[in-house]
């Protein structure tokens, strides 16, 4: 019997009830192989009366027997196999019914068409049915977690054979489907195109060859006949024809003709043609051609050589041609002027003056005529810009009037137009917009504050902010748009309509009844809507009105005493509306006594200001005050204080409201005035009757009065009736009508004049035919020749409709502009604000459009359609106006938009087609068949849709892009993809919990590496599986680094948070603030558009993908999510998830873990959850909901699990000067790009090291200065900086937590022991003050002052300073500066850094990568190896010394005994102590040399140093459980983070290291020593685990090994009992496993297990016992001593450095013994003075040097 599990797998294989001919037998064979059974077939011939043979097949399998018969060509074996499969699958229905097929088309009853169509149908149906059925078999109808686990079934479990065959078959069928659907049609089309193209080329080539042969024969004949010119002409004609120049010429002429006709050029006047710039250019070309032709006629030989020779003489070929062209251009200009004078009838002077003036005059007159209309004049009262333009018309007219040489007609036009232009000018002067009517009530802003708070200083920035709101944004507007009013001067001299008036120190004059303060009453007049007529001293400035819109008063006292006005509230009502008390913030103020009153006030302390800012606006705060007569002060505070930014926004908002209110009132008054009139100006009270006008005028002239005339008219009833009608209808001609009539006459005369000139020109051209022909031909030829020059600017853009692959029609590359959102920063489109409009039906049923933002209100273009037409119309039925309205104004939220969308969804008609993908579900891009149309131009322009939410889009392409990773792991050599994870804060990321379940189901070993990758950065982070969970037999348990996220009811979400702190993981930016709040979830009603950032994998590697999500909506029901059917055993087949988000999206396997963001500009926070599942069949996706509250709860849970998880609260923030969207270039390796800096750093390119005067005299140089700039090496540009940085981005090892913990705890024990009994431990268990961190404690040699001569770091080094190094901020010489502005600014930066670290913010510390200017071996310099030094910023150095320097001093005071040699004086007895320690375990010693030590540092060990060593030290004097202790721990953690994951800059590229520590930090050597001790203990553990597991603990390491470290140098003394295993060879091997290069220090090439103490070097010094001193001494390498004499440094006197080096060399060579001393002494004394040495050096005797060493009697020995 087969197992139930096997039968279930078989049933899944046999679910498909229909198999095809090709697969029947093979499928049954596969089933048989699965059951390890055989299928037996028996064939028998059956007697049949038919002519065709009949066979019977008997199929036996698993006890079943099937018999089938086959006739003729039918295969009974296949039929038997099919029926056997049907029997096994339980299908008893052998006839499923008829199959629907395509109907046959009618083709004129021709049987051939019928047979052809049937054959095509059979072929198509066969392919379609095959593809359809194959896809149906493998189609998945359940919801699966998309974590890429369903692709792992084929290779993993040998014991589980269930479903292997089916999965292989499904995979093959999938590939067949993809091939049939994609590859095959393309191959067929390409083959057909290739064949056709090849055939065409062959035919074309054949024709071309025939043509060439014929031309060659013809030319040969002409040459035989000696017709050389004719043969040359034939060749030229053939070339012209062969390359299609003839057709091109015809096309150019036709295009030019079409464009001329289309542009209406024939309607241009002759004058316009004459003045056209092309006419000028064409004429020059014609004259040049004529000149060249004339040159050819110079007497002489006519052959080409002679022609070129002669052309060379007039003068020098090309130069001569250029000069001739210039001369011809001058002559043409003269001729052109003569033609103009002849055509226009002007003299030369008139032509020069009137050149182009007539057109300007006519345009000016037409513009004046335009503003005479009533509707245009009304605009003057509403629009300042229109008023200014009308004013300029009068000024321009005066300019035209001054022209003395205008024609009579033009002069008449100017004089006629001047009077109405003047009247318009006067109308503008009296217009309300110029101050003569109702005006805007100005905003009265009253700023009150004590003297010295800085009121005046912040006034101009405030004015600039208000002017910007007014639209005056030029940089100098604040100069002339702000008027300073001094009331004591009485007059407003200099006022030119400024919008802002400032009363500085207002109301200083006492107000008295007899001597009133004019400011008081001016406040009442100014703060009003009535026109304020200003008192001006100059006569021409009279009639000036105030146009101020903001009145700004500053004063010291808000209790203004009023005596001269009867109603004081009129003053306070105006001033109290915007009254604010100004004061500095507390942190920027200083308490100052107010006179002798005993009261104090806060005065601005200028020493606390930011010296980098000219005006620091952040120091002010503004408190609103309101009038309250009940209070003692008369005023009380209202609301909370505002900072400057909020205050400026408030003032601008108030101005905007007042401005809008003023415009509304003015508009109302104008409308009210119109309604008050009896009729319009055109329908006034009088009619037109010339008889009554003449009669009345004559009788009035005779002396009759109007009353007498009317009395006479009344005596005749019929006449009075006519007079009454005349009086009722006629109106007297207004002055504007007179102006219009007169100007119409003048314009008519002008047109008549121009027409007359046009006829004269025609007559002249007719009388001069030669000139006419020359001009026309010249223009035609010139236009043809220049057409090609202008074609690029004239031709419309042509584009290929779709890419065809044809090189002739390929689309040219263009600058890209992003229409939708692709995620690429380089093509990101700036989104313009969207104007929201509203469609609604009024009471009459008409559609109206209204927009509150722009004030638009009008009827819709759809009102001309009936209801039936409106309901049934399609987009093609709309007219031009309706389409424009629909495209420009209808949004998805408008009534009209919703109507069309809902109706067209039912009718399946798409109105909107999205050009790019914006994420809007209603505008998804329609799929369109693409057809190549040759050179067809794109006529229809698609309306594009911009990004609906710019904030969400920037979040996607910036933060999501850098915080999202793809997770994967290796099994063997194959990589398996898991899914996505996203870092939400610092080192903490979230991922679906089913990832953990799936990994556990695969039974991966704990040391399996989970890799986190991004596009172009694979395996950027590597974490062992043991970091996530510990596995049991049937279950697993999350470690302290992970926590699940629960719902409120206790159920868990499909989400787990993981903290990767202490791993090779960089801190990330904070995403938590972008997640929605729980209170926001209630707002997510309906459906939204969204997006998610994910990764896909293809043959090219990993690449980022943005999926746009449609109809994102809450899903309140529970959903069942199935684990993939991948052959692994899960704890459960499925799990339930409730309260999800559902959306429509083509998600795919591997998208799980992607963050879901909404595109909704009204939603402040955009992230709502994480993708956890999808349904491939229905294209539905599901997301786990996430909020800020649940994430914060998870962070707290992590901290409760383990105190080290306090690191989960930390995050990185990009500094302000860094643009995260900038295209940053990072060195090769594993680095994390951050962006581009606005501040660029430079590099030193010239070395300060120079050869000395005795270079090469004493020894052959073995070193030279390192390269400091890019250099060409081996024909390639070598950048030494990037080459050196590449070493810091190498892969590092992933170590076991247990072994690292064991080693680090043992190192902690050694380091914290007190070996120096003279030390007071409490002196070092404290935090230094700021002053101590800079100048030192002054009582400890290892807590000395900071080095102030070195670089201050970034960005201080880029600031302007007057002293080198850090002295600008810390002082010079013996004095330390703590009070200057620079010193205070530095202190502020240090305090801010410490505060940031305390709050969990890692930011604003950037190390500068620079090349180290030093001597290196010549071989290394020749290959470009230069060491890189990373200088830290000084504010970080100070802060780090505050918290870590005492611990470093403790280690140095206990040196040597604690394995650390830092602080050792190599000239003192310290070297003897080191030698003794290295002999305690015997004579076996090794001294290894690390290669690329800094670049190989493992972040795991660096964090172990912090947590297992330093924090243990910190706990001895700080209680980290209370708030203050927790704060100090956070500060230290933040400062340490700046080292382990340091941020660097080179040029302007900012990036982060994933591990290592920068060489320029103040703790470099100490960290390297501690690291060295830990890594050597790890080597012991691994070596002993291989050879002697019994001895792997730290007890035996300390028993058998004595270690000394100094940075990356170390020496080990190993006991003889273990040296067989723990030696140089084995240590190097295990170091390689840990990604460290550790070789023999001697570099002799001989591999030895150990050496003797006297054979090794430590710090480039040997161990030599001195019989004279009776102790071990430290002789420097002899070659180093001699090499130092070959070099000096650039300085004022390089010889002084040389003499100092000679003295040092003798003090060093003494340690080598008397023989080496004598050798050096003889060599130096042999040098000539002054040729080789500047002076005779001082050389002591050998014994004197020994004496100095014994007593350390030289500054050199003060190490």
From Swiss-Prot:
The residues annotated as site (Cleavage) are: 97-98, 701-702, 818-819, 901-902, 1209-1210
SS bonds (residue pairs): none
Can you supply a Gene Ontology BP term from the record? symbiont-mediated suppression of host innate immune response
Signal sequence: where? none
Residue ranges constituting the SF3 helicase domain according to the UniProt record: 421-595
Q: Can you tell me which residues the record assigns to a coiled coil?
A: 113-140
Q: Where does ATP bind?
A: 449-456
Identification of the protein by name:
Replicase polyprotein
Q: Which organism is it from?
A: Drosophila C virus (strain EB) (DCV)
């Amino acid at each position: 019997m087969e197992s139930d599990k096997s039968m279930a797998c078989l049933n899944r294989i046999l679910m498909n009830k229909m198999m095809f001919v090709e697969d029947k037998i093979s499928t049954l064979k596969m089933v048989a192989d699965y059951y390890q059974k055989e299928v037996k077939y028996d064939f028998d011939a059956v007697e049949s009366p038919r002519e065709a043979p009949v066979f019977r097949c008997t199929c036996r399998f698993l006890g079943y027997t099937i018999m089938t018969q086959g006739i003729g060509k039918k295969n009974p074996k296949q039929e038997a196999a099919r029926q056997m499969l049907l029997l096994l699958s339980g299908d008893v229905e052998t006839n499923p019914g008829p199959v629907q097929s395509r109907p046959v088309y009618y083709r004129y009853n021709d049987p051939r068409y019928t047979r052809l169509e049937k054959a095509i149908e059979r072929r198509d149906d066969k392919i379609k049915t095959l593809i359809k059925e194959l896809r149906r078999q493998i189609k998945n109808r359940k919801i699966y977690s998309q974590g890429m686990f369903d692709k792992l079934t084929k290779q993993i479990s040998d014991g589980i054979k269930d479903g292997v065959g089916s999965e292989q078959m499904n995979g093959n069928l999938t590939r067949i489907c993809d091939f049939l659907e994609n590859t095959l049609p393309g191959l067929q089309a390409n083959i057909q195109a290739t064949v056709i193209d090849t055939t065409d080329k062959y035919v074309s080539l054949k024709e071309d060859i025939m043509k060439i042969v014929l031309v060659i024969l013809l030319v040969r004949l002409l040459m035989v006949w000696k017709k050389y010119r004719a043969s040359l002409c034939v060749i030229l004609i053939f070339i012209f024809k062969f390359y299609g120049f003839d057709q091109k010429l015809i096309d150019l002429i036709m295009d030019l003709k079409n464009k001329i006709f289309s542009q209406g050029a024939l309607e241009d006047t002759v004058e316009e043609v004459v003045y056209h710039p092309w006419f000028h250019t064409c004429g020059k070309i014609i004259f040049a051609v004529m000149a060249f032709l004339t040159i050819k006629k110079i007497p002489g030989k006519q052959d080409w050589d002679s022609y070129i020779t002669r052309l060379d003489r007039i003068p020098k070929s090309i130069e001569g041609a250029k000069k001739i062209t210039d001369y011809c251009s001058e002559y043409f200009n003269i001729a052109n002027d003569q033609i103009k004078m002849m055509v226009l009838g002007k003299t030369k002077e008139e032509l020069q003056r009137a050149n182009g003036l007539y057109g300007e005059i006519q345009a000016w007159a037409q513009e004046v005529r335009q503003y005479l209309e009533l509707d245009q004049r009304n605009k003057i009262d509403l629009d300042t810009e229109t008023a200014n333009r009308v004013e300029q018309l009068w000024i321009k007219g005066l300019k035209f009037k001054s022209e003395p040489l205008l024609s009579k007609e033009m002069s008449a036009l100017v004089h006629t137009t001047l009077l109405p232009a003047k009247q318009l000018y006067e109308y503008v002067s009296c217009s309300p917009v110029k101050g003569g009517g109702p005006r805007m009530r100005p905003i009265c802003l009253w700023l009150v504050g004590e003297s010295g708070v800085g009121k005046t200083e912040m006034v101009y920035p405030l004015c600039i902010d208000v002017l910007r709101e007014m639209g005056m944004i030029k940089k100098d507007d604040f100069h002339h748009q702000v008027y300073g009013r001094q009331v004591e001067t009485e007059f407003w001299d200099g006022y030119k309509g400024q919008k802002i008036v400032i009363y500085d120190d207002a109301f200083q004059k006492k107000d008295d009844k007899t001597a009133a303060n004019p400011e008081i009453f001016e406040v009442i007049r100014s703060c009003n809507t009535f026109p304020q007529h200003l008192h001006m001293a100059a006569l021409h400035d009279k009639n000036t009105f105030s146009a101020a819109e903001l009145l700004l008063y500053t004063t010291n006292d808000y209790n203004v005493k009023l005596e001269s006005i009867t109603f004081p509230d009129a003053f306070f009502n105006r001033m109290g509306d915007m009254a604010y008390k100004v004061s500095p913030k507390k942190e920027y103020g200083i308490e100052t006594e107010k006179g002798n009153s005993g009261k104090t006030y806060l005065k601005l302390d200028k020493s606390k200001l930011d010296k980098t800012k000219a005006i620091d606006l952040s120091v002010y705060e503004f408190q609103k005050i309101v009038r309250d007569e009940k209070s003692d002060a008369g005023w009380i505070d209202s609301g909370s204080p505002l900072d400057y930014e909020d205050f400026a926004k408030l003032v601008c908002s108030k101005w905007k409201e007042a401005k809008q209110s003023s415009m509304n009132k003015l508009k109302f008054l104008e409308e009210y005035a119109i309604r008050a009139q009896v009729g319009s100006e055109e329908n006034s009270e009088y009619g037109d009757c010339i008889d009554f006008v003449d009669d009345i005028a004559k009788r009035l002239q005779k002396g009759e009065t109007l009353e007498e005339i009317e009395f006479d008219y009344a005596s005749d009833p019929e006449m009075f009736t006519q007079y009454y009608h005349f009086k009722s209808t006629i109106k007297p001609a207004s002055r504007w009508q007179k102006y219009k009539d007169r100007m119409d006459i003048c314009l008519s005369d002008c047109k008549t004049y121009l027409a007359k000139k046009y006829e004269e020109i025609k007559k002249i051209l007719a009388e001069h035919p030669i000139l006419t022909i020359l001009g026309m031909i010249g223009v035609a030829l010139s236009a043809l020749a220049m057409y090609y020059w202008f074609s690029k600017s004239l031709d419309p853009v042509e584009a290929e409709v779709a890419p065809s692959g044809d090189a002739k029609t390929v689309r040219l590359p263009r600058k890209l502009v992003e229409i939708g959102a692709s995620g690429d920063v380089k093509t990101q489109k700036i989104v313009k604000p969207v104007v929201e409009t509203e469609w609604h039906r009024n009471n009459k049923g008409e559609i109206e459009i209204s927009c509150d933002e722009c004030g638009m209100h009008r009827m819709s273009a759809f009102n001309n359609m009936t209801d039936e037409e409106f309901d049934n119309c399609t987009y093609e039925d709309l007219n031009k106006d309706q389409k424009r309205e629909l495209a420009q104004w209808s949004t998805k939220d408008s009534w009209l938009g919703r109507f069309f969308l809902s109706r067209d969804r039912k009718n399946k008609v798409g109105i909107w087609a999205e050009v790019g993908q914006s994420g809007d579900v209603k505008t998804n891009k329609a799929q369109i068949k693409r057809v190549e149309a040759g050179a067809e131009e794109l006529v229809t322009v698609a309306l594009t849709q911009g990004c609906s939410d710019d904030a969400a889009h920037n979040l996607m392409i910036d933060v999501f892009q850098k915080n999202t990773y793809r997770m994967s792991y290796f099994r063997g050599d194959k990589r398996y993809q898991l899914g996505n994870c996203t870092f939400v804060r610092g080192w903490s990321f979230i991922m679906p919990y089913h990832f953990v379940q799936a990994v556990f189901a695969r039974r991966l070993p704990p040391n399996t590496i989970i890799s986190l990758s991004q596009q172009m950065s694979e395996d950027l982070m590597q974490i062992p599986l043991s970091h996530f969970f510990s596995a049991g037999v049937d279950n697993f348990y999350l470690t302290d680094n992970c926590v699940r996220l629960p719902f409120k009811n206790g159920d868990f979400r499909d989400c787990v948070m993981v903290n990767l702190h202490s791993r090779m993981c960089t801190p990330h930016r904070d995403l938590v603030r972008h997640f929605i709040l729980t209170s926001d979830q209630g707002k997510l009603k309906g459906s939204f558009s969204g997006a998610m950032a994910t990764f896909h994998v293809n043959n090219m590697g990993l690449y980022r993908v943005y999926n746009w999500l449609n109809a994102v909506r809450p899903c309140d029901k529970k959903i069942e999510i199935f684990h993939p059917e991948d052959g692994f055993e899960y704890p459960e087949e499925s799990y339930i998830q409730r309260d999800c988000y559902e959306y429509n999206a083509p998600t795919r396997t591997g998208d799980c873990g992607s963050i879901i963001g909404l595109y909704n500009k009204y939603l402040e926070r955009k992230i709502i959850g994480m993708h956890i599942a999808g349904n491939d069949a229905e294209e539905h996706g599901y997301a786990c909901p996430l909020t800020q509250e649940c994430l914060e709860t998870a962070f707290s849970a992590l901290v409760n699990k383990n105190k080290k998880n306090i690191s989960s609260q930390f995050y990185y923030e990009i500094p302000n000067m860094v643009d995260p969207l900038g295209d940053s270039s990072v060195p090769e390796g594993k680095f994390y790009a951050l962006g581009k800096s606005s501040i660029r750093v430079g590099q030193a390119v010239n070395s300060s090291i120079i050869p000395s005067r005795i270079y090469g005299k004493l020894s052959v140089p073995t070193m030279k200065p390192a390269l400091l700039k890019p250099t060409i090496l081996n024909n390639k540009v070598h950048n030494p900086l990037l080459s050196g940085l590449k070493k810091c981005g190498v892969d590092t090892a992933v170590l076991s937590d247990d072994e690292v913990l064991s080693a680090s705890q043992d190192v902690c024990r050694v380091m914290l022991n007190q070996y120096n009994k003279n030390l007071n431990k409490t002196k070092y268990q404290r935090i230094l003050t700021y002053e101590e961190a800079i100048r030192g404690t002054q009582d400890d040699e290892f807590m000395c002052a900071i080095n102030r001569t070195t670089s201050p770091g970034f960005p201080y080094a880029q600031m302007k300073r007057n002293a080198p190094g850090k002295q600008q901020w810390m002082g010079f010489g013996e004095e330390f500066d703590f009070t200057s502005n620079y010193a205070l600014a530095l202190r502020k930066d240090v305090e801010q850094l410490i505060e940031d670290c305390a709050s969990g913010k890692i930011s604003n510390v950037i190390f500068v990568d620079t090349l180290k200017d030093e001597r290196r071996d010549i071989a290394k310099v020749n290959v470009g190896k230069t060491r890189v030094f990373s200088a830290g910023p000084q504010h970080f150095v100070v802060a780090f010394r505050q918290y870590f320097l005492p611990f470093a001093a403790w280690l140095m005071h206990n040196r040597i005994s604690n394995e650390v040699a830092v602080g050792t004086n190599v000239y003192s007895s310290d070297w003897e102590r080191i030698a003794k320690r290295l002999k305690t375990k015997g004579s076996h010693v090794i001294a290894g040399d690390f290669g690329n030590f800094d670049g190989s540092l493992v972040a795991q060990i660096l964090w172990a140093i912090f947590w297992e060593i330093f924090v243990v030290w910190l706990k001895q004097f700080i209680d980290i459980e209370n708030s203050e202790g927790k704060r100090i721990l956070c500060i230290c953690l933040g400062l340490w983070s700046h080292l382990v994951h340091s941020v660097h800059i080179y040029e302007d590229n900012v990036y982060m290291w994933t591990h290592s520590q920068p060489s320029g930090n103040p703790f470099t050597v100490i960290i390297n020593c501690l690291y060295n001790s830990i890594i050597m203990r790890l080597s012991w553990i691994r070596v002993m685990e291989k050879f002697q597991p019994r001895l792997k603990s730290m007890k035996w390491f300390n028993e058998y090994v004595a270690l000394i470290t100094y940075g990356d140098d170390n020496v080990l003394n190993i006991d003889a009992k273990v040296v067989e295993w723990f030696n140089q060879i084995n240590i190097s091997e295990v170091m390689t496993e840990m990604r460290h290069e550790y070789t023999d220090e001697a570099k002799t090439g001989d591999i030895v297990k150990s050496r003797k103490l006297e054979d090794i070097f430590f710090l480039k010094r040997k161990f030599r016992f001195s019989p004279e001193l009776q102790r071990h001494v430290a002789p420097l390498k002899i070659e180093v001593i001699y090499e130092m004499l070959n070099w000096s440094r650039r300085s004022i006197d390089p010889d002084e450095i040389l003499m100092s080096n000679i003295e040092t060399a003798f003090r060093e060579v003494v340690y080598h013994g008397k023989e080496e001393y004598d050798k050096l002494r003889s060599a130096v004394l042999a040098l000539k003075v002054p040729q080789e040495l500047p002076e005779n050096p001082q050389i002591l005797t050998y014994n004197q040097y020994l004496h100095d060493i014994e007593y350390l009697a030289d500054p050199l020995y003060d190490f």
